[in-house]
């Protein structure tokens, strides 16, 4: 099983806008896309346990305190390793993140062609943060929703890892 690690240096305060999650729901219908949702109840249980958090084979959060997890409403993870699905997913994610209200925070490509795009959508105190990673033959999207403080995440050097 290949492990894709998305290390995030976070520079802004973020919470999440529930309405935006509906825009991503269609990604789960793409052939080859695996979709996992970690809801508020599970996040609260993880927050009570303390330390780093590993949600099975799907997601690991390192450096995130229980107080930070309590501010999350849910985490959605979309993974795809099928070539046609990766292309379709990439186009749909680009369409969403280039849409009205989304602010790009980080956009980058490395020498191997791996791409990362981190964007946020704010609505009042809540916002949605989308972390999209793409490389040859696979893509992963993490959508965080809640009232998180990105500044604190930077200070704690939070690392988000997606296992696929």
Q: For each predicted feature, which ranges?
A:
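Localized chelating/binding microdomains
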Residues: 14, 22, 57, 73, ...
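Acidic, glycine-rich flexible loop segments
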Residues: 104-126
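Extended, compositionally biased non-globular segments
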Residues: 86-89, 139, 161-164
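A recognition module on extended beta-rich or small alphabeta surfaces enriched in W/G with H and D/E
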Residues: 150-164
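Mid-length scaffold segments of soluble, non-membrane domains
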Residues: 70, 75-112
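Early exported N-terminus immediately downstream of N-terminal targeting peptides
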Residues: 23-84, 88
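A short, solvent-exposed beta-edge/loop patch
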Residues: 119-149
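Bacterial Sec-dependent N-terminal signal peptides
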Residues: 1-26
């Amino acid at each position: 099983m290949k492990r894709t690690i998305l290390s995030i240096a976070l520079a802004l305060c973020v919470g999440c806008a529930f309405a935006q999650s509906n825009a991503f729901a269609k990604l789960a219908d793409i052939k080859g896309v695996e979709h996992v949702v970690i809801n508020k109840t599970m996040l609260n249980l993880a927050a009570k346990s303390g330390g780093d958090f590993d949600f099975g084979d799907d997601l690991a959060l390192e450096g995130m305190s229980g107080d930070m997890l309590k501010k999350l409403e849910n985490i959605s993870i979309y993974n795809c390793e099928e070539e046609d699905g990766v292309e379709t997913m990439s186009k749909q994610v680009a369409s969403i993140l280039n849409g009205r209200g989304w602010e790009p925070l980080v956009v980058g490509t490395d020498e191997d062609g791996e791409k990362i795009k981190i964007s946020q959508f704010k609505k009042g105190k809540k916002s949605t943060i989308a972390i999209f990673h793409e490389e040859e033959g696979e893509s992963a999207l993490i959508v965080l929703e809640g009232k998180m403080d990105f500044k604190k995440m930077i200070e704690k050097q939070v690392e988000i890892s997606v296992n696929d």
